[in-house]
Structure formats: structure tokens, C-alpha cells
């Protein structure tokens, strides 16, 4: 690949809590080749969990699957309000409502309430009173297999709840 064949865009943004970087490389030949290898454009819009996976995946693995999805396409944001109270927001974004509805069903089987909203994309939110149950479900036996940044927000939130109870 020669430098002249590429269209490269770079972007860096500064946010209150850090930086975000984005690098995009555009080349028609590269896109065609990736497509030939099975990487399809806009896969998020066509992503489904097929019936075979739903039927054959052992129940104890679904928490790991959902945690991986949260780590990849979700958020766990921690804020402190004007009364110095910690507020945790947890959710997942997707172009596929089906996958979020499936997660909602799976969590409901574990007595965890969630909501699916439609905006420009679909988003999935955990009900505030079930945040602790949700995280216990996700992290109960994950060992080191977690995105530490999101897990840390949860532990800070739970610690703040414990302090407010005492």
C-alpha cells in the first residue's frame, strides 16, 4: 500500500475525564478484501444471536457474553451530583434492537430489570434499583476477564452505597 492510495483521517478529542483518539484508513481495495474475508459493513445493524447459540450456550456463560458486549459497546459512567452522591449509569448501545431485547429477557430470568429505548440507535439501560444485582451477575466469576475501568466505576459506586448505609 502506497501512501498515495490511502485516505487517512485523524481525530483527537479532549474530554473532561481524558482523551479519545480515532484513526480511520479508507481504501476501496482494503474494504473489498475485508468484505471477501467476511467483515461486512454495518455489521451492528445485522447482528443477531441465532437460535442455535441461544439453545446450545450453557446458561452460566451468558453473563460473560453480556459483560463482553458491555465492555465493547456499553458504558458505565460514574458521576457525583451536587449533594456529593454517586450516580452510576449503565447501558449498551446497538443498532440491533433484537440483541438488546434478548439481553433484557436473559436478565429478567435473573430478576434484573432493564429498559430498551429507541433514539438514533437503540440503547439498553439497567434499572437503578437493580444495578448491584446486574454487576453481581456480570462479575461473580469473571476473575481478571473484565474491563477494569468500567468495573472500577461500579466498585466506587457500591462503596459509596455502603458508606451511606453506615
Which residues are covered by each model-predicted region?
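Internal intein/HINT superfamily modules and their associated LAGLIDADG
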Residues: 1-166
Amino acid at each position: 500500500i502506497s501512501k498515495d492510495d490511502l485516505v487517512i483521517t485523524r481525530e483527537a478529542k479532549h474530554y473532561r475525564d481524558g482523551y479519545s483518539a480515532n484513526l480511520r484508513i479508507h481504501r476501496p481495495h482494503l474494504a473489498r478484501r475485508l468484505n471477501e474475508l467476511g467483515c461486512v459493513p454495518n455489521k451492528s445493524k445485522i447482528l443477531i444471536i441465532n437460535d442455535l447459540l441461544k439453545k446450545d450456550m450453557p446458561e452460566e456463560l451468558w453473563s460473560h457474553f453480556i459483560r463482553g458486549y458491555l465492555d465493547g459497546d456499553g458504558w458505565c459512567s460514574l458521576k457525583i451530583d451536587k449533594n456529593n452522591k454517586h450516580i452510576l449509569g449503565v447501558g449498551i448501545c446497538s443498532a440491533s434492537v433484537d440483541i438488546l431485547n434478548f439481553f433484557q429477557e436473559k436478565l429478567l430470568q435473573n430478576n434484573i430489570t432493564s429498559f430498551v429505548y429507541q433514539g438514533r440507535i437503540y440503547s439498553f439501560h439497567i434499572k437503578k434499583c437493580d444495578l448491584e444485582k446486574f454487576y453481581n451477575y456480570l462479575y461473580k466469576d469473571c476473575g481478571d476477564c473484565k474491563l477494569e475501568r468500567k468495573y472500577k466505576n461500579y466498585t466506587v459506586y457500591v462503596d459509596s452505597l455502603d458508606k451511606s448505609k453506615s
